[in-house]
Structures are given as C-alpha cells and as structure tokens.
UniProtKB/Swiss-Prot annotation:
UniProt keyword list: Mitochondrion, Repeat, Transit peptide
Residue numbers spanned by region Type DYW motif: 727-822
PPR-type repeats, residues: 48-82, 83-117, 145-179, 180-210, 211-245, 246-280, 281-311, 312-346, 347-381, 382-416, 417-447, 448-482, 483-513, 514-548, 549-584, 585-619
Family: Belongs to the PPR family. PCMP-H subfamily.
Gene from which this protein is expressed: PCMP-H89
Organism: Arabidopsis thaliana (Mouse-ear cress)
Pfam families listed in its UniProt record: DYW_deaminase, E_motif, PPR, PPR_2
Name of the protein: Putative pentatricopeptide repeat-containing protein At5g13230, mitochondrial
Keyword Mitochondrion set for record: yes
Main location per the UniProt record: mitochondrion
Disulphide bonds in the chain: none
GO MF terms held by the record: RNA binding; zinc ion binding
Annotated spans, Type E(+) motif: 696-726
Amino acid sequence: MIVFMRIIHVAQTRRLMIRCNRIRQCGFSVKTAALDLESSDSIIPGLDSHAYGAMLRRCIQKNDPISAKAIHCDILKKGSCLDLFATNILLNAYVKAGFDKDALNLFDEMPERNNVSFVTLAQGYACQDPIGLYSRLHREGHELNPHVFTSFLKLFVSLDKAEICPWLHSPIVKLGYDSNAFVGAALINAYSVCGSVDSARTVFEGILCKDIVVWAGIVSCYVENGYFEDSLKLLSCMRMAGFMPNNYTFDTALKASIGLGAFDFAKGVHGQILKTCYVLDPRVGVGLLQLYTQLGDMSDAFKVFNEMPKNDVVPWSFMIARFCQNGFCNEAVDLFIRMREAFVVPNEFTLSSILNGCAIGKCSGLGEQLHGLVVKVGFDLDIYVSNALIDVYAKCEKMDTAVKLFAELSSKNEVSWNTVIVGYENLGEGGKAFSMFREALRNQVSVTEVTFSSALGACASLASMDLGVQVHGLAIKTNNAKKVAVSNSLIDMYAKCGDIKFAQSVFNEMETIDVASWNALISGYSTHGLGRQALRILDIMKDRDCKPNGLTFLGVLSGCSNAGLIDQGQECFESMIRDHGIEPCLEHYTCMVRLLGRSGQLDKAMKLIEGIPYEPSVMIWRAMLSASMNQNNEEFARRSAEEILKINPKDEATYVLVSNMYAGAKQWANVASIRKSMKEMGVKKEPGLSWIEHQGDVHYFSVGLSDHPDMKLINGMLEWLNMKATRAGYVPDRNAVLLDMDDEEKDKRLWVHSERLALAYGLVRMPSSRNRILIMKNLRICSDCHSAMKVISSIVQRDLVIRDMNRFHHFHAGVCSCGDHW
C-alpha cells in the first residue's frame, strides 16, 4: 500500500511539473499561472505536506521558482495547509528566487514559525528591517543558536548596517557562542567592515578551535583596514599553526605586500603560488596582475595573464584597464579583440575600460563600433558605460553626439556633467562649457573639484574675470577652493584673465603645492612676458626640492622667448637635458626656434630643426616661417612654408603668413596667386576677432564691424582717438594693411581693426574709475595697433591690456611690457 501511494505521488508530481513547465515555456507570468490553476480542477488531489515538500525541494534544485509558485497556488486553491517543514521549503524557494515580497507575505501568514524560518528569511537578505526581525525571533521565544547568530550577522553586513553587529555580540557571549569558530568568523567579518580591528582581534583570540576560515578572516580584516605589516605577521603565525595557505590567503598576502610596497615579498608569494599551482585561480591571478602592473612590468603581467583560464571576464577586464591606464591603448584594443574571439562576454567594467582607451587614443571609429556593441549587449543604460561613451565622442571632437547621448541619459551623475563640461572646455568652447556648468548648478548636481577646474578653465578661455571671481566664491563656499586641483585652476584663470598678481597670491595661500601648481604660476608669468620672474620661480621650485618636469621647462622657455632672454633660454634648454635628464619634445624645440629666430639667429634655428631626432611638426616650421618673415629672409620662409604644406596641404595659417610676406613686399600678383590657391583648396582664413567683457556680457568685434548697437558712440570715440594720437606723434604703419589700396584707404582701414573697436567700446562704456581695460584677441596684434595702443595709453591715462594668441601686452604710459618684441 505504501509503495502504491508513492507511485501515485510521483505520477501526480510529474503531472504538476509538466503543467508548470508548459506555463513557463509559453511565457506566462506567475499571476497567469495562478489564474490558470484556479480556472481548472486541481491536478493533484489528495497530496500531503510531505509530497508538496518533495516537489518544492525539486523546484529549488532545478532553480524553477515559477513552478514553486504554481504549486503554492494549487495548495491555496484546495485550501490545503502545509506543515512547518514544507512551508519553510516554500519560503526558501521564494527567498532564493528573489521574490522578496512573496517571501515576506508567506512568512507573516505562517501559523507557526521556528528559528529555521527566521534564518531562511535572513539568509536571503529579503528583510530590510533586520533588527525588527531579530527582535521578533527573540520575542517569540525561538532558540538562539550559532546558525541564527551567523545568519543575522551576515544580514546586517549585507544591508550596510554592520555598525549594529556589536549589538549581537553581548547575547553571543552570554550564551557562550563567542568561542565558536562559525560565529567568530562572522563577528570578525562584521568588525572588519566597521573598521574595529581591535574588537575583531579580541574575538579571534577568544575562539578555541581556530580553523582556516577564522585565520583567513582575521588576516583579511587587517589587510582591508590598512594594517599590512600586522597581516603578514598573522600569515606567518597561521603557517606556524599548521594551516597551509589557500587561494584566499594567497590573495590576502598579495594585497598586504602590495599595500606595504614590499614587492620582493610579493614576488616570493608568487613563487609559493607556482609551487602549489594556485595560479589558475582567478582571484589569485588578478592579485598577481595587480602586482606586476603596479610595478609597470606589463611583460610579466602578460605572462601571468596567459597562464590564467580564459573563460572568466575579470582577468580580461583587469588587463584591458591596466593597459589603458599605462598608455598602451593599442595593446588594450588588441586584447579586447582577443577576448571577443574567445567568446567571453564583456561586462560593464570591460566596456568602460576599453572605451576609456578609445578616448585617450582618440579612436573615433572603434568607439563608434563599441557603441553598437554596448547597445547590443544591453549596457547602454549603465551610467558608467554611458559616461565612457560620452567621453569618447567628446575627446574625438564630436560634441554634438556626446551632448545627444548626455541628453538621452535617464539618470545623470556628476561624472556625466563633468564629462560634457570638460569636453566643451577642451575644444575651446568656453561659453558652452560655462552654460553647462550653470545648468549643473540649477539641477543641484554635486559639484566636485573636476567641475570647478573645468568651469575655471572655461572662464580662462573666455578671459572673463567676473565669471571667474563668481566661481572662486562658490568654490570657497563649498570648501573646494583649498583643493590642489582647484587652486591650480584658479592660478591659471587669474593669470589668463590678466591679473598675475592675484594668481601669485592664490599660490602663496596654498597649503599643498604640487608640480602642477609651480607650472601654472610659471606659465602665467611667461604669458605676461615676465621671463625673469619665471626663471626666479624655477629656482625657488628647485630649492624646495620639487622636481621640475617637461611642462615646467616649456613654460620657462616660453617666458624667455617672450622676454627676449636669449642666453638664459639656451642655458635653460641645455640644463633641462644635462641636469634633469628630460628629453626635449616638439614643443620645447618650437620654443627654441622662436627664441633663436627672435634674436636673428636663423641659421642656428634651422640647424636645430635639422638635428631634431624625429620628424619636425607643423608648429616648429610655422615658428621658423614667422621668424624668417620678421627677419625678411625669403629663402628660409619659402622652405618653411613648403615643409608645412607637405605635412598639411590645407594649413590656413601658412597661406596667410606667406600671403602677408608677399603683401609686405608689395608683390600683389603673388598675393593674388596665394589667395586663388586657398580658394581652390577650400582653405578659409580665420577672421580676426576681439572681445571685451562688460557687466557680465561679452562683446565681440571684427574688422569694420558696423552693426553693434553702440556703433555711433564707438565711431565718435575712434575719431577723437585718431585726432589725439596724431597730435601726440602717432604715424600709421601702412605696411600693416595687406591690401592693394591707396594710403587714405589704408589709414581708414587701420582704425577699424577689431582691437581698436573693442577699445573704443571700453572707453565709452566703462567708467574712468576702472583703471584697467582688458581686451582679448584670437590672432596676433598687428604692428600698427601695437604702436597706437602705446600712444593711446598715455592719452587716456589708463592701463590697456591685450591678450593676443601668443601673450599679454600691458600698455602703460606709452610703453608695452613686451619691449616691442612679440
């Protein structure tokens, strides 16, 4: 009879499983399954709790929560009741499936519960009120055993409530479970998360029979909280206690030795790993990868990687990320391709890393292909992957696409905003960058030092002192002004807005100074033509044991060039190589060509170019071309122009410079030929623009502008300035007009240059109490405007500051800070 009943139960179970599978295969929801069962007679009449329990256990084994729910529906339809044992199995099925709401409802409806019920709910982290759950268990009088305490300790940690774990320590001690290894390991982990290393050590000492899990837990506690040396001592004690290291302890030993910088010890750990064959474990393997990549030994890292199993995405992702961080973007791309060929599916970390590599290498094509893959594998909604995609398009100068992706984000974090702001700022779109910064503030985005640095960079590119001061005030208010990156950006902003004295005061108030701080200050002095001060700052920097880098010397060389300090510049260049072991880059050579060209040493400059160990860039030849034109050396000018056009046949600046050279020599036929070539090649001359800020608004002026609302006042001021300047001895330099026209027309043309229009507006609208007028210009100031500004500064008795594409010109009482060399 018993055998017969079991056969019936098996048959009924199969019928229910088949029915549930059909429901699930058809794509119906759990609710649909319940309705389907309710709409028909029960398919398994007469089953008892034991049979139901067996069926539910089978659902758990097959990871089939839908069938478990269908069985539950059938039980409810029949009005049957499960015993406590079977109900706990059903509760376990819901918990493991992640059906938290159903699990909690079932738990609350249970007519009786035992500690297994509470532990089951706790183990699945389905309860968001762990204290209430524990109190209920205690209130209902259920047994408190090691399993209960361990489950609740893990629940507290999983819900980021580890700080209340000590609350359980007292009853654990009271019941004598503090010496239990199972409970002790959970307590050690909880105290580790809280940062209470001493309490964890006390628990460890109280455990009578310490197993490998307890030892691994206390060692990990010390490592995770930064006690690397003590953790290594504990590892030694563990070995002396007779426990052989395993994957977990090897991983911990690697973390500790790397944290201490004991790389030789870490390599010794690697030797032990090789002896015990643990290298194939992904966790240990990643620890070794971290060791060798941190040492910069990508070769040994790659050897370790090749010994690891290739079916785990973690090692692939780690190596791709490290290649990108070390500047090996091509190698990262090759590795990603190998990963795809091995049929390993990338995760969000992999995609973010390879996209960062594309952004660094400006690989637009690959970035677009990866964009398609991101959408295909469903990571386009991941915020980190989306931010990396935006960064790729921004760095590849495709801001329209970057902004479109940004707008489509369902949720944005501060990195999303920063990426777009930085993208605009790097492209010289200061206005758009600052607008985005304002939008971020309106959206109550948490502004970081990156946000402030980018916003200040935008103010610097706009030369907007007013906006920069506002950002500075906000940085002070949010306690960001003292951060090194923000302070460095403040130095740069004030210097580029013409106030080098305030830039120096920001530097003087810095609590922490890094090499970028010195570089920002040196660059500021150099841009203002104060080469001697730049040299003095370099000496102070070296006296304070701060090692200068390539950017430091680039700023100093630029300052020497702007100030005409030929000998000092050459000595600085030689010292950079001789004393500091810094190999010159193209920018250093460009500064030296400008320096030598300014002193008329064109032969020496040409020899320097010919001796460069790599191919000279457009910038170097352009510096040589400009110097040759200033010295009226047509031979070198022609050669420089030819070299530039070999590299870039559509280089607009070269056509303009050569055209200006012919115009200066009144070779109008050659000028016409150059302009015809520009038209045929589709090369357009960048229009000269000057701008000035007044009351928060920026006013732009181009040559001969006539549509400004204050044009009548501007023209009146220009006529007055022309009259006063002529009486003061100003003589127009008609060679500055590179057009074939009569002298009268040339004189008129000179007085409608963009910087003079901006100056006239400033004199009309800015009160005389404002002693300084700052004008920005996108091109080099012409010789006639330079002469006129010197005279006008004496007439109006105000400081006139013009920042052109190369440097600042401070006009005061008829003298310019550049010494008439620019």
